[in-house]
Each structure stands twice: as structure tokens, then as C-alpha cells.
């Protein structure tokens, strides 16, 4: 695509995968321009949300500004949301316009699938900080009652159990309420 100019690398996302990609590219001597596309120049440290219900952490504690990281790594941040791809992935369509690339890394994370019956009545921590804050607020409002904690498995991969965060929430809430 860029026969006469320097190769352009585009990274989608601002989580662990995206930031590790940037760091490794630079550590291995890559000097090509890197554009990172994400709505905000911040990392949401999701492993720490287990501490929000107890009040040991707040959103402010878990949002890491990335401006200095981008400056150190010589990365251009495009504050935008991705809306699509074209030209076999060589053009990224965003809410701020199109971005051409010679190499594309999609590290935008996964999406939580809300397919379990009744899940619309549940607060699901996998959805991020706002969910953990809702759990915190509901716990503060309670004067008694029952708390149900559960998780579902992937029927296409029955040997894998991904309930770790739910156990962390469960044990943290148990400790908090004792």
C-alpha cells in the first residue's frame, strides 16, 4: 500500500492487548508510525473492579491515563470508535474518518453476550466498572436479604470454566458483609 512512504501500523483498542502490542513493537526496534484508535486515551484496569463493591477502589483508582505512555512510545492516539473495515482490512473506518494502514492489529477486546435467560435482571461485572459500581450501590442499600451469584458456561467449550471473576466478587462481598 505505501510503496514510497514508511509503513503505517494501526492498533485498535486501548486495553492490555493493544498496549502490549505497542510496547513489543517498539522493544523490537519498530520505528514505523503507530496510530492507536480508541475512544479515550485511558486504560480501564478491569481486574481491579473486584474491589469497587467494598469501596477499596474507585473508578478513579482504576482508570490509567495513557498520554505519557503514548508520548514515550511515539504513538498517535486517534480518539474515535471503529465503525468498520474495508479494502481487506487496509482501511479502518472510524467516527473520526478513515485511517489507512499497512499492518492492522485488532485488540479491541471481547463483548459480553447476554444470552442466559433472566440475565436482563442481573448485574454482570464482566460489563465493566459501571456494573461494579451498581453492585457497590446495591450492597449499600441492603439491610438484609439474599444475594445470588452465578455464571454460565460456554456450551461449545464445556471443559472451560470462566467463573473466576464471579468467585472473586463472591468472596470479596462475603468478607465485606461479615
Q: Which residue ranges define each predicted feature?
A:
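Beta1-alpha1 glycine-rich phosphate/pyrophosphate-binding loop at the start
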Residues: 2-75, 156-178
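FAD-binding core/adjacent interface of flavoenzyme oxidoreductases
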Residues: 1-7, 74-176
Amino acid at each position: 500500500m505505501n510503496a514510497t512512504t514508511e509503513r503505517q501500523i494501526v492498533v485498535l483498542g486501548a486495553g492490555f492487548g493493544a498496549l502490549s502490542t505497542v510496547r513489543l513493537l517498539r522493544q523490537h526496534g519498530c520505528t514505523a508510525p503507530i496510530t492507536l484508535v480508541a475512544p479515550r486515551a485511558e486504560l480501564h484496569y478491569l481486574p481491579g473492579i473486584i474491589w469497587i463493591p467494598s469501596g477499596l477502589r474507585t473508578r478513579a483508582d482504576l482508570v490509567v491515563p495513557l498520554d505519557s505512555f503514548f508520548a514515550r512510545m511515539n504513538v498517535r492516539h486517534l480518539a474515535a470508535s471503529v465503525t468498520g473495515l474495508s479494502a481487506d482490512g487496509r482501511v479502518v473506518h472510524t467516527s473520526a474518518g478513515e485511517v489507512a494502514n499497512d499492518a492492522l492489529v485488532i485488540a479491541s477486546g471481547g463483548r459480553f453476550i447476554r444470552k442466559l435467560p433472566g440475565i436482563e435482571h442481573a448485574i454482570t461485572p464482566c460489563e465493566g466498572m459501571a456494573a461494579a459500581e451498581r453492585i457497590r450501590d446495591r450492597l449499600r442499600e441492603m439491610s438484609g436479604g439474599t444475594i445470588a451469584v452465578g455464571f454460565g458456561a460456554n456450551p461449545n467449550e464445556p471443559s472451560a470454566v470462566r467463573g473466576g471473576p464471579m468467585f472473586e466478587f463472591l468472596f470479596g462481598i462475603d468478607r465485606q458483609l461479615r
